[in-house]
């Protein structure tokens, strides 16, 4: 076998430059000098006999050849990481890291409790939780950057054929009110009562907002007629606003378990209407599945009955 015209260190430098946007920042992230980075790139261009960067541009702009090298180089590095994880697994779970992805609400309110159960049983395994949008998490699974993910949104169409998407559990979205609201004395309200409320919501592009609007419309409730007091960008902000008496809101039951237990919020049901969304587990069948990932799925995720019962 002939020697390769590049090294893993050179590929890592390329990846760092692409990520950081400059030779200087790449050098800092790798804890090496900038001249060392420049020298490695010069050697790589000489070995491959191609220009990797556009020298006419002051910024680190890849040429077409450089883009191709970066794309395949990232695949090589990803496979190397996968190889290391597989070898680490052979040590019978005596260590290693499990990387889990989750969408915003799921990652904030559900996964920490489940990870706690896992860490209690397997303290020798480190766990990383990456919380992002469903789309970003799905791409991380596809690229092998996370072992598995639990999401509440729709996986991008372009990834659905590459990933295994398993329905996990239904997550109910509850209508919450301030404790002093007149409806807080009721257990159930009627559909028409919704038009009398002032709502605090997530923005229209959020997955939860779309689920709520769709289900309400299916039950003959025109959410476009709701009085929207304000739109906020986090569930925590919405809960605080409701507690302050600013309005009502729909949020995941998993996000209000503590507040309901302490009597800080009131959950009122709507006659004949239940709003649910399905949480899904996503994995990449074409990637190596770590033993820790399998154990988390079989022993921990199966313990989950409903978000409110954890």
Swiss-Prot record:
Keyword check for Ubl conjugation: no
DNA bind region: 23-42
Domain HTH lysR-type residues, every copy: 6-63
Keyword S-adenosyl-L-methionine set for record: no
Family annotation (CDD domains): PBP2_CysL_like
The entry's keywords: Chloroplast, DNA-binding, Plastid, Transcription, Transcription regulation
Superkingdom of the source species: Eukaryota
Record-level GO cellular component terms: chloroplast
Cellular localisation: Plastid, Chloroplast
Recorded GO MF terms: DNA-binding transcription factor activity; transcription cis-regulatory region binding
Entry's transmembrane regions: none
Function: Trans-acting transcriptional regulator of RuBisCO genes (rbcL and rbcS) expression.
Family classification: Belongs to the LysR transcriptional regulatory family.
Record protein name field: Probable RuBisCO transcriptional regulator
Organism of origin: Guillardia theta
Gene name for this UniProt entry: rbcR
